[in-house]
């Protein structure tokens, strides 16, 4: 995982932090130029900056969490794979003539145990994002994912999926190639696999594109990730014909981790470093690795039949509600 120093990319709600950081730099520079000791004042300002960061990130709105989830420097699937696993080997091709770079997968070792890892992969710059379709997988990508999952099932290797996509690729070509069928096939087949499956939302979890690799025994989610049936912008455009109402849509859609945990859709929230996973990728990766190891240890104690039944029951409960008679 890259740790090189780069100029931070600030989100709009982080501007007060930037102003305070600039003030600290100015005071430090003036003190050096004039030979004045202002270390006490700087310590106070740095403490205030830490407190302000914690205040801001503990009270984020759903639309602000969405900005964090979409941060260009948020750790990607490949970042996490490189940070948490050993002996990673990427496997290519859907065996139908394609190899979608937006959905990657391969074999690795996690804690010394062989696993199959797959996930959506966004780009790090404009050129890379275009090449990877901004993490929006084609039908071939989902077929490649299914091929790797069948490989995992054959050789009794647990499956780890990392979800980070606004949705499946929404093009005419993708529809002609059977986008709906490819995702539906994955949904059906993932329920029948014998091996443990752990799915983690590391950034955006959007629509059927997320579900295509999202059926598992456990569904984990980073604190500032989002998981939704449609992007708030799309929802606002559909319901109100006005994409500017996406903040209201984000609230109504219940896209954030604590809402989804309360609704029983996700199983565990992974805490992020203050400032988001992009502010301290190694700490985020350590949290993810430990959560995966803990959950794998629990799932390994179950028989394949027990896992399949629990997996089925988990998803059957989603969306159940109680109707109150008037």
From Swiss-Prot:
Biological process (GO), any one: fatty acid biosynthetic process
Keywords, comma-separated and alphabetical: ATP-binding, Cytoplasm, Fatty acid biosynthesis, Fatty acid metabolism, Lipid biosynthesis, Lipid metabolism, Nucleotide-binding, Transferase
Subcellular localization(s) per the UniProt record: Cytoplasm
Reaction catalysed by this enzyme: N(6)-carboxybiotinyl-L-lysyl-[protein] + acetyl-CoA = N(6)-biotinyl-L-lysyl-[protein] + malonyl-CoA
EC number: 2.1.3.15
Positions of the CoA carboxyltransferase C-terminal domain: 44-298
Pfam families for the chain: ACCA
GO molecular function: acetyl-CoA carboxylase activity; ATP binding; carboxyl- or carbamoyltransferase activity
Major localisation: cytoplasm
N-terminal signal peptide: none
Involved pathway(s): Lipid metabolism; malonyl-CoA biosynthesis; malonyl-CoA from acetyl-CoA: step 1/1
Superkingdom of the organism of origin: Bacteria
Keyword ATP-binding: yes
InterPro entries given in the database record: Acetyl_CoA_COase_a_su (IPR001095), ClpP/crotonase-like_dom_sf (IPR029045), COA_CT_C (IPR011763)
GO cellular component: acetyl-CoA carboxylase complex
Presence of the UniProt keyword S-adenosyl-L-methionine in the record: no
Record's function text: Component of the acetyl coenzyme A carboxylase (ACC) complex. First, biotin carboxylase catalyzes the carboxylation of biotin on its carrier protein (BCCP) and then the CO(2) group is transferred by the carboxyltransferase to acetyl-CoA to form malonyl-CoA.
Family per similarity comment: Belongs to the AccA family.
Subunit annotation: Acetyl-CoA carboxylase is a heterohexamer composed of biotin carboxyl carrier protein (AccB), biotin carboxylase (AccC) and two subunits each of ACCase subunit alpha (AccA) and ACCase subunit beta (AccD).
Name by which UniProt lists this protein: Acetyl-coenzyme A carboxylase carboxyl transferase subunit alpha
Originating species: Nostoc sp. (strain PCC 7120 / SAG 25.82 / UTEX 2576)
């Amino acid at each position: 995982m890259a740790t090189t120093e780069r100029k931070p990319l600030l989100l709009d709600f982080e501007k007060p932090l930037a102003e305070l950081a600039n003030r600290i730099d100015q005071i430090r520079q003036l003190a050096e130029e004039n030979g004045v000791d202002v270390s006490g004042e700087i310590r106070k300002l740095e403490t205030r900056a830490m407190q302000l960061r914690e205040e801001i990130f503990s009270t984020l709105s759903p639309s602000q969490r969405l900005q964090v989830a979409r941060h260009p420097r948020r750790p990607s699937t490949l970042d996490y794979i490189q940070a948490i696993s050993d002996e990673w080997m990427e496997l290519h091709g859907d065996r139908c003539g394609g190899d979608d770079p937006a959905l990657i997968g391969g074999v690795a070792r996690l804690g010394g145990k062989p696993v199959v890892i797959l996930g959506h992969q966004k780009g790090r710059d404009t050129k890379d994002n275009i090449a990877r379709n901004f993490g929006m997988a084609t039908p071939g990508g989902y077929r490649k994912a299914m091929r790797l999952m069948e490989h995992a099932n054959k050789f009794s290797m647990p499956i780890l999926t990392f979800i980070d996509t606004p949705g499946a690729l929404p093009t005419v070509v993708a529809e002609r190639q059977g986008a709906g069928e490819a995702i539906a096939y994955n949904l059906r087949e993932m329920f029948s696999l014998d091996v443990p499956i752990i799915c983690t939302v590391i950034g955006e979890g959007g629509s059927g594109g997320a579900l295509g690799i999202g059926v598992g025994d456990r569904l984990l989610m980073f604190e500032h990730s989002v998981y939704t049936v449609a992007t708030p912008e799309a929802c606002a455009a559909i319901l109100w014909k006005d994409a500017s109402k996406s903040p209201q849509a984000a609230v109504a859609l219940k896209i954030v981790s604590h809402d989804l945990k309360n609704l029983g859709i996700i199983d565990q929230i992974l805490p992020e470093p203050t400032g988001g996973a992009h502010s301290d990728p190694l700490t985020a990766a350590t949290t993810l690795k430990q959560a995966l190891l803990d959950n794998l240890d629990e799932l390994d104690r179950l028989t394949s039949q027990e896992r399949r039944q629990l997996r089925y029951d988990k998803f059957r409960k989603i969306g159940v509600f109680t109707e109150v008679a008037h």
